[in-house]
Amino acid sequence: MEALLAVEETGNDLWKELKELYWAQYVQNSVDKVQFERYVRKVKSADDYWLVRALLAFSDSRKACTFNSRFEWLTMQAHGRQYPPLASKDAGKLIWNARREFRYAEPQQAAYKQLARPRGDAVADIQQHPDLGNCSMVCALINVKRTCGTADMVADCGDVAQVNLFFNGARRLVTLHRAEVRQNMRREQLAVLSPDMHDKLIEQAYFEVAHGMNYESMGSNTAMDTYMLCGWFPLVVETSEVDFPFVQRYLARGAMLALGTHATRTIDSFCLRKNHDYAVLDVCGTVFRIRDPLVAGNVIELAWEDVRTAFHLLYINWDAHTQCQLYEKFHFRYNSAVHNRFMSWLNKPTYRVVNDTESELPVYALFERHLSNRKYDNSIVGVISGENLVSDTEEGNNIGMQWVELTVPPHSSRILFYHSNTNTNCTLHLFSNSPRLKVAKWSSAESSRLAVLDGCWQPISKNLTFTHWPAFKFEIKHPETDGVHVSLQFCWANEHSAALFIYHASDYRYEKPLLHRPGPLPFPQAFFELALDTNTPYVVLCQSMDVGADAAFQLAIQTEKQGSVISTVPTSRAYGGLRFHTSKLVSTAAKRIELPFKVSRSTDLHITLYSKSSPLVLKCAVFSDGSDEAITATPGFVPINDYPYVLPITFAKERSLVLLIELQDTVPDSTVTIEIGSNCAFNFCGHDVDLARV
């Protein structure tokens, strides 16, 4: 203890300074060159082997500083303590966290004080301490020591022990302030029972990271704890859902296995504990040799069919490096405010895997959610063929690790997406065997065959519902084909129903929708498919059934035809989408109404009539001032109601124009709304003229 205080309080300013250099390099992103060179001279004169080794490791890592390495330093915190991505063998006496006492449950604390339950080291093999609920960690430790050893996990340097565990996307360093666990006067300890002190140090590091220095553990699962110890891929499946060939496939890869019983029941004939994990020592034929971590030397042998009956969960860990030569990892931040706006994979973090070879290639991908105080949050990983709007597969769980094994055909691609129900940092670990298999973050903007349109609804007047819903004009261009199959995905971010319409852009009255699902869409996501002509403009209208809606929506348009290019532009049904517009409310007390107006130059005209107050029958026409020939007109008398009537769109060459309205019958207490859109500025001239009074 005295030696440790010397390290922390007086002596090792050089170690503290090295820690500050790490912090400046990776967190603050600025290292003073003069300060660093001065520090190197100090280390040379100190003649400390461990310090020199730690400095060399720092210099090497600085030369290879990448986005990944910086991200791993920026995400080194868990439970308020720091765990840098350093190897235990290179860390020396670097102390990253202040001393803090572990917390014990009341029964554990009472047992410790009474000296009744702590155990000594008189055991031949690793055993779970009966007062600690860490069967999963002990099973993991049994399997890891037996399969790949723990020599590289722990390094002793004087009064400091350094332990490597895998979490938060990297192999990370846990500094223990004493190379021993807490003991009573008899040198008995409340820890894993083992003749190897390194096992106790590994367990202490595990409880610090996984449970925030709290020995009152409710357990985890062996697959996750095995990953934390050695970094092997974790997989958790229900025994009832897999067959023995499935198990054999992983055994052939050298996998470690463990089994978990039901939380509520066990089969009495097998004498197993409820809600407890067991290590699988080996499998001979179809017979599993199983060990209870609480009891050393007691091996249970069960055939596969009995295993399926007696156990609920099968835990698998396997080393992907044995199957693949190439490894990449990608760190990203999952922001639920951004990525959970809509029920669509197009809003999720996505990575594209491209196979540019003549043969199909296997790919193994693991998405690792970083540690947080929130447990049992759901995560989902999906696979997309090409750029389809519907995923091929989606798998999810709540353990924080989700992995997928896929095969990418020759000259093809697959897209991986990740979903979480909360904010988190995440890491994608990806293994493959070909340097020609390329992986990169993907965005829908990279595709010419996929258009993603974002918009929003805002509260509007009931008088404007038809014309003021958001709309987009789009066209699918292709040099060779006349028609394509089109898929659409429509998502919105409120609980109200919605509707989607598609029209030919030439259908200026919007009378013949090519797509209009009968009735409103009740769910905040809908898919459609239809055939459209290429090189032909269309208009799509996104409607909310609630005029007071204040919410975002997203529309995706996709075609599988190679060589297609989708172009889009926002438009509006109001005023024909033209730049200049005005509306005028006119009384229908007179039978004939003349509205003169002027335009600044020759222009397109889009004229809409509707009446919210009462149905009307009228005819309407536009003339050049002084001319008897109509530029555009209704085909005689037409009914006008709350569904707008659009006059044929026309081009007016003259600047002085007159809009003439003639009613079949006057309606004194009613009005008609006139909306005019044009390409240039215009204005009505003077007062309305009632021709019936002239």
Curated annotation (Swiss-Prot):
<feature type="domain" description="Calpain catalytic">
    <location>
        <begin position="80"/>
        <end position="320"/>
    </location>
</feature>
<dbReference type="GO" id="GO:0006508">
    <property type="term" value="P:proteolysis"/>
</dbReference>
<comment type="similarity">
    <text>Belongs to the peptidase C2 family. PalB/RIM13 subfamily.</text>
</comment>
<feature type="active site">
    <location>
        <position position="276"/>
    </location>
</feature>
<protein>
    <recommendedName>
        <fullName>Calpain-like protease palB/RIM13</fullName>
        <ecNumber>3.4.22.-</ecNumber>
    </recommendedName>
</protein>
<dbReference type="InterPro" id="IPR051297">
    <property type="entry name" value="PalB/RIM13_Calpain-like"/>
</dbReference>
<keyword id="KW-0645">Protease</keyword>
<dbReference type="GO" id="GO:0004197">
    <property type="term" value="F:cysteine-type endopeptidase activity"/>
</dbReference>
<dbReference type="InterPro" id="IPR038765">
    <property type="entry name" value="Papain-like_cys_pep_sf"/>
</dbReference>
<feature type="active site">
    <location>
        <position position="135"/>
    </location>
</feature>
<keyword id="KW-0788">Thiol protease</keyword>
<comment type="function">
    <text>Required for the proteolytic cleavage of the transcription factor RIM101 in response to alkaline ambient pH.</text>
</comment>
<keyword id="KW-0378">Hydrolase</keyword>
